[in-house]
Amino acid sequence: MKEKKVILKLRGVTKEFEEGQVLKSTDLDIYEGEFVTLLGPSGCGKTTTLRIIAGFEEATTGQVLIEERDVTSLPPYKRNVNTVFQNYALFPHMNIFKNVSYSLVEKKISKKEIKERVTKLLEMVQLGKMEGRMPNQLSGGQKQRVAIARALANEPKILLLDEPLAALDLKLRQTMQLELKTLQKSLGITFVFVTHDQEEALTMSDRIVVMNKGNLEQIGTPKEIYEQPKTKFVADFIGESNIFEASVVANEEETLTLMMENGHVKANGTGFKNEEIVYICVRPENVRITKEIVEGFTLKGFVADQIYAGSVMRTIIHLPNGDVVKVNTHPMETPLEIGSLVNISWDVDKAVIMHTTEDTVYDAIEFGLLNSQGGLEVNEK
């Protein structure tokens, strides 16, 4: 199998403003042809990281390397990267063709090549018959396509996208997610995408970098991030989760027996000690509601509500101590009586057990191991 080429490296990159440090020492490898998303809440450092890669922001310490060339001190136009912004930044007095071709004209590329390149790009973003229109004649989605085509005109090695879909309505945003992913695969260039939207990240990414308070919390494929969160923050931030605190009371052949305040449960896990306090994370779709007791589980609760949500039925279970369990089931299942007592369980391999250590940080380089996808697995630091 051909070894993946690292196109972008961050080494010990930090950023401090007057109000404090917004990006802690960051090491990150991004591969050629990869779609990587920097995902996290407002203020986590994702946009700062993107701006440092682009050259719009100067790192306080550390290095940025593109194709092994140190570009840390170079201006944006010397880095062979382009950026697509949320506000499109189109020239209002130029038509679509002139907007897309602007940088090529400035570089004095031949008119023939400009025509060929711009025509091809406009076809790729489904605007082939609209090259004469002005920006004020375009919808939000069309403006975004023009901005992407313009950013690709210079044939950058890396395309940076700073929350480019945030201003679009839900339906258009979902359409653009698929279009962007298809475009990226057809071009084969590296996309680094910034968003706070989990659905965007899960839908489009080859790998996701989850950020929190200036740290890289976890790096992995969408499946790894969703099904095997490494920290409570990741489990809580990505999708819906039921997160409980429990104590390990028995450990037999990688199956843990755990005591919650409301009863005993089981889950798979290694590296945990008896009497250790841990977090249990179970996704709502993996929780089972039964009238019968399941071996190894003594967790009971009362049905507080059932909500029809189209593709799923959301059931809310209240435990005796006031904790809430969210359960997603098929809407065709027989409704439960509100107030009825039920048993709660799950398959032992569907629960994720996490240490309760605060501020767990993952360093993708110093402690990195190649996973089955060729990406970096990260271990606790």
Kindly label every feature range from the protein language model.
Residues G62-D70:
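Conserved ABC transporter NBD signature motif
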Residues S241, N251-K381:
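Non-catalytic connector elements of ABC transporters
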Residues L39-P41:
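The feature captures the beta-strand-to-loop junction immediately N-terminal to the Walker
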Residues F35, L74-Q86, L90-F233:
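ABC ATPase nucleotide-binding domains
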Residues K9, D29, L65, N343-S345:
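ABC ATPase nucleotide-binding domain
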Residues L8, L23-S25:
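Conserved structural motif at the start of ABC-family nucleotide-binding domains
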Residues T26-T37, F91:
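Pre-Walker A (P-loop) beta-loop-beta motif of ABC nucleotide-binding domains
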Residues A54:
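Helix-to-loop junction immediately C-terminal to a conserved catalytic motif
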